[in-house]
Amino acid sequence: AHPLVRALWQPRLLEALDWIAAETTERLAAGHRIVWMEEKGELAVQGVVLSGKPDRIDRAPDGTLTIIDYKTGKAPGPKQVAGGYAQQLGLIGLMAEGGAFEGVEGRAACFEYWSLARDQKTDGFGCIVSPVDPSGARGRIRTEDFVETAARNLEAALNRWLLG
């Protein structure tokens, strides 16, 4: 990389990586376990193979799964997700619940984007945002409905463009 680019971005990148390390350490201390990272999985849906490579899947102390996607910039907004245009986390949840990732079992109950962008609240780099909400507040999909919603959207797309 150009020396100027390196000088401008390296401190930001290092701060963001330190943030990820601190967040991960805190979660591990609270009983979470990383159960899957950066490996491809596959799930057949209506005869079509859905493949995906989640950035990370954690198992919470209660046995549920947390689907994590790292973002170098801004994460998709709730309107994009609710509108069906950003379903990655829900589809990875569907795949995890369907056995696409060997040894990963459980219900996907938490969906997070870990953004390396500047956090407006702390002015530091790194923040966790969820595109869903437990109660469906602020126009978001209810957390417990996200996997089912993503599955319905996938099936509708398959029927419209591939199978129909």
PLM features: residue spans?
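Structural signature of nuclease core domains in nucleic-acid processing machines
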Residues: A1-G164
